[in-house]
From Swiss-Prot:
It comes from Vaccinia virus (strain Western Reserve). The chain crosses the membrane at residues 101-121. SUPFAM superfamilies: EGF/Laminin. Residues 1-18 form the signal peptide. One of its GO terms (cellular component) is membrane. GO terms for biological process: epidermal growth factor receptor signaling pathway; positive regulation of cell population proliferation; positive regulation of mitotic nuclear division. Disruption phenotype: Higher doses of VGF- virus than WT virus are required for intracranial lethality in mice and for production of skin lesions in rabbits. No effect in cell culture. The keyword Transmembrane helix applies. Induction: Expressed in the early phase of the viral replicative cycle. This is Pro-Viral epidermal growth factor. One of its GO terms (molecular function) is epidermal growth factor receptor binding. The keyword Transmembrane applies. Belongs to the orthopoxvirus OPG019 family. Disulfide bonds join 45-58, 53-69, 71-80.
Length: 140
């Protein structure tokens, strides 16, 4: 994993941690100490961000320069360009699990059918190969 992706991952974690909270900035000087109004940690991109994110919202982080994407459900990637496969999507209900692995019983039946088919084919080939041709019987 390159350093660029690690930095992007770290930035995404920061963006998510500040996504729902606005933080007040406090300015101090020797004479004046006051709290300013809340500045949102992230804000949506303006018209310059239209079309930047393929399946999500374009956002600007307060502490980080550049545009980032907040992907819609089922998409991932820097610009939300990758579809998350159905097998790997988390269910909306955390108590349910979805398994796409065939049960051992089905696997055993399939393996058994394959073995029986191979045995029958080998017996058929062996008997066909060893069958002696019928010789004409000559009556004296």
């Amino acid at each position: 994993m390159s350093m660029k992706y690690l930095m992007l991952l770290f930035a995404a974690m920061i963006i998510r941690s500040f996504a729902d909270s606005g933080n007040a900035i406090e300015t101090t000087s020797p004479e004046i100490t006051n709290a300013t109004t809340d500045i949102p940690a992230i804000r949506l991109c303006g018209p310059e961000g239209d079309g930047y994110c393929l399946h999500g919202d374009c956002i600007h982080a307060r502490d980080i320069d550049g545009m980032y994407c907040r992907c819609s459900h089922g998409y991932t990637g820097i610009r939300c360009q990758h579809v998350v496969l159905v097998d790997y999507q988390r269910s909306e209900n955390p108590n349910t699990t979805t398994s796409y692995i065939p049960s051992p019983g089905i696997m055993l039946v399939l393996v058994g059918i394959i073995i029986i088919t191979c045995c029958l084919l080998s017996v058929y080939r062996f008997t066909r190969r060893t069958k002696l041709p019928i010789q004409d019987m000559v009556v004296p």
